[in-house]
């Protein structure tokens, strides 16, 4: 199988062949001013418009030959398989997640749903009003009395739209990421069921480098927006608000043990919501061109991790880098230097455009990216640098603080 057809991501800008997205849906209809902060959204969204804008995003990728698969559809197809359905429900509908006295009834009810309905509720959440009226246990009566018909039996997962974070393909394998905030951790279990059972993946040749949604990873948290397999045996990993040093070391250890990478470059980021992941301040647009938010990127503390002298024992050689982060990345790729396009405009406009994901672009191939339309200054600078910028509407999709890079989980991408 060639690099173009086997599962795996071998660069940040090589031809994008296959990508997973997750369209807005029931989970976003259940966002309210009262719960959106807990669910990591800054505001509620106009869901119908968000759906239209997301469809446009998908269409523009398909127009360039990208195979786009949606997590809703993959999950529904997975839940049509009896073994997969039982595996997932046994792990998701538990006393710990749903409640003693409720879990058995809820699991039995969900076991009988159609595959499409089950997938919708696994992503969109289950409220008291969804459950059959003949659920008459004492525990159900207490739930209805105190939580009402709109109380969450299973909370929604609106951040599933940001498929980049839940799992990340690094060269010929994938990580199943234990995410930082409790509001997102159940997303990984859904992704694991797809990779384990769906026919696109069940018989494919790939490794799970690290991560297990059935395991407590403690302080080791990882999110895909911090992870970039850039080629030449190099992986960039941001260490900031969401991804911890413990997880980075474990991922590096696994990649080195399997011979999948030779060097992990760690970008130490300030712990800011506006810079929650590396890809909110730094993304690739071409083989030698990146867009950066200088206020953060210029402050990155850079470290390189390589296998220790005796690679077999799992020890790591961790060393600080003296050069700026962008220069270290260019050197690791064998380039004289990386060209940079900074967030555009004056200091006010730069801060606004970074907040609106001006640096969070996704490359479809070298020199072609998708970006939000509202970031006019940054997009103009990218075009002046020779990049083809395809725009999508930001108004609703951007309210969860993620752009095109965040909303895509590349599954097959060529090297450069």
From Swiss-Prot:
Compartment annotation: Cytoplasm
Top EC group: hydrolase
Annotated catalytic residues: 406
Catalysed transformations (reactions): L-arginine + H2O = L-citrulline + NH4(+)
Single biological process term from Gene Ontology: arginine deiminase pathway
One cellular-component annotation, GO: cytoplasm
Entry EC no(s): 3.5.3.6
InterPro entries in the cross-refs: Arg_deiminase
Functional pathway: Amino-acid degradation; L-arginine degradation via ADI pathway; carbamoyl phosphate from L-arginine: step 1/2
GO molecular function, one term: arginine deiminase activity
Keyword annotations: Arginine metabolism, Cytoplasm, Hydrolase
Pfam families membership: ADI
Gene3D superfamilies given in the database record: Arginine deiminase, L-arginine/glycine Amidinotransferase, Chain A
UniProt similarity note: Belongs to the arginine deiminase family.
UniProt-recorded name of the protein: Arginine deiminase
Classification of source organism: Bacteria, Pseudomonadati, Pseudomonadota, Gammaproteobacteria, Oceanospirillales
Protein encoded by which gene: arcA
